[in-house]
């Protein structure tokens, strides 16, 4: 599977909605279920976070970052960030040998990062003229 499909929030939403027999694409509703401790939602969220950590670990093995920044709209949700951080701890504790654990942080601009980047690019391009 491609990471974009496996690690996407849409994938998480679809899995939880299907497991609960509900038709929705509302991520806020899904995270409300997780926040209130819904067993199905929490179990699938934990599985999702574990899948994401495998992908982040692969990136770590290739690029060796000390810090991994999580962005996008979902990064504004503390439940998501906490879930990823918990999965990181669980993953690295399960390894048979010590392995450096990257710091997981939320990106500063979250979902607005692309707009900030586009604006800075615009300013630089127009400053060159």
Residue ranges, per PLM feature:
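ATP-binding/phosphotransfer module of carbohydrate and carboxylate kinases, centering on a glycine-rich
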Residues: 1-129
């Amino acid at each position: 599977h491609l990471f974009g499909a496996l690690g996407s929030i849409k994938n998480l939403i679809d899995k939880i909605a299907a497991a609960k027999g509900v038709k929705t694409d509302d991520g806020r509703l899904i995270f409300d279920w997780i926040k209130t401790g819904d067993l199905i939602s929490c179990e699938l969220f934990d599985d999702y976070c574990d899948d994401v950590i495998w992908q982040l670990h692969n990136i770590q093995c290739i690029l060796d970052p000390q810090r991994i920044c999580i962005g996008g709209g979902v990064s504004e949700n503390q439940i998501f960030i906490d879930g990823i951080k918990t999965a990181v701890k669980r993953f690295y504790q399960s390894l048979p040998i010590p392995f450096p654990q990257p710091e997981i942080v939320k990106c500063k601009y979250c979902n607005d990062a692309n707009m900030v980047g586009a604006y800075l690019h615009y300013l630089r391009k127009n400053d060159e003229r």
